[in-house]
Design a protein with these regions (language model features):
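PP2C/PPM-type serine/threonine phosphatase catalytic domain
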Residues: 1-126
């Protein structure tokens, strides 16, 4: 399974907070048999020194959804950006209760709306 590391995403030497996230994705047998590409996407970002965000998306897995791999990538990008914005707003909170309330009330609809807009823009760019 090929693995890669983008050095631009690594913290500078001597950084106080160091997170390490390993991700992997395997092309399934059905995708191999039908020639479909891997439609999985994952993104991991350190949004604050004390907060690491991970987003995972799985494509539709059908030839009819030929943009599915791109849609998955857009989904994890949008999710990490939205989580980063949420983390910035919640910086002063000391308990999980406000985070849960904010996440359920605003984060999921924000991700969905931003993802749909990103997909529309991506389709229009083709």
């Amino acid at each position: 399974m090929p693995m890669s590391t983008d050095a631009s995403e690594l913290p500078p030497p001597g950084a106080q907070d160091l997170w390490l996230a390993l991700t992997a994705s395997q092309l399934g047998a059905a995708h191999q048999a039908t020639g479909l590409p891997n439609q999985d996407a994952v993104a991991v970002r350190q949004v604050r020194p004390d907060v690491l965000v991970a987003a995972v998306a799985d494509g539709h897995g059908h030839r009819r959804h030929f943009r599915s791999a791109r849609g998955s990538q857009l989904a994890v990008t949008v999710a990490c950006e939205a989580a980063q914005e949420l983390a910035a707003r919640l910086d002063g909170f000391q308990t999980a209760a406000p985070i849960e309330s904010e996440a359920l009330g605003a984060l999921v609809p924000a991700i969905t709306g931003e993802w749909r807009e990103a997909v529309r823009e991506d389709v229009a760019a083709d």
